[in-house]
Amino acid sequence: MSNATKFGKVAVLLGGKSAERAVSLDSGQAVLDALLRSGVQAEAFDPQDRSVTELVNYDRAFIVLHGRGGEDGQIQGVLEWLNIPYTGTGVQGSAIGMDKVKTKQIWQGSDLPTAPYRIITKETDLDSVIAELGLPVIIKPVHEGSSVGMSKVEKAEDFAAAIEKATQHDAVVMAEKWITGREFTISFLNGQPLPVIRLQPPADVAFYDYEAKYQRNDVEYGIPCGLSETEEKKLQALCLRAFQAVGAEGWGRIDAMQDEQGNFWLLEVNTVPGMTSHSLVPKATKAVGYSFDELCVAILEQTLEGTA
């Protein structure tokens, strides 16, 4: 890229301390390699190994930190304080997007469809949860991504083990009504929705979990997604409203379901999605003509807004 010098010195933020560190290292290395191939002066920067105050030596930052510390507004706040432009969503939108309950509350308040849920505490009567949500349910840590700590619960006697698994990752746990149907993901670039992708994990996988996302090679990705043109546009419009409602910006991803009656349900938002070989944003942008290198440069272009 002939004018790559306009970016100056770029820190590719990767790794970190969250449960998603390994994925972030893979994503970050892929982004770093793409930027270097594009002529950008980019360097890896792992906040686990270096003080974030060293970021003053860079002109801008490409955030590829997944999970806590990188996707929850913390590193965004540091970069704001240091007056360093960065990719993706700002402090508030990142903090909201990392909190599944806050996200749902905002969507509900915006009259957007999201699956019913209950916050689980030690005092929660699990029978009342089953009465309200039915079975199966999915148990989730509220502040983790990449499906870390999630479990599908089909029998009441399995509740306790699923909650114990989730609490290993987060003090706050939620139960969400299980939506039977087709799973879709909608990626965003420059704040606009990309072609919808249908996710079809193999039959032995209960849902699109961590292993399916990053380790298995038998997940099917449907592009085109199998929806009619009208339905796809409806889902894209719904997800754009949801993306904007939580304050997400630039690039990201929203996961959704279509139930057996044809209704769409929003699951969650990802403000720093994966950028590995298995990842969904690169698959969506490839469908509209972007190479991976072009995608990375396009995301970085966002940091020039108002500074060029």
UniProtKB/Swiss-Prot annotation:
Organism, as annotated: Acinetobacter baumannii (strain SDF)
GO BP term, pick one: regulation of cell shape
Known pathway: Cell wall biogenesis; peptidoglycan biosynthesis
NCBIfam families: D_ala_D_alaTIGR, PRK01372.1
Cystine connections: none
Described purpose of this protein according to its UniProt entry: Cell wall formation.
Keywords: ATP-binding, Cell shape, Cell wall biogenesis/degradation, Cytoplasm, Ligase, Magnesium, Manganese, Metal-binding, Nucleotide-binding, Peptidoglycan synthesis
Protein name as annotated: D-alanine--D-alanine ligase
Encoding gene, per UniProt annotation: ddl
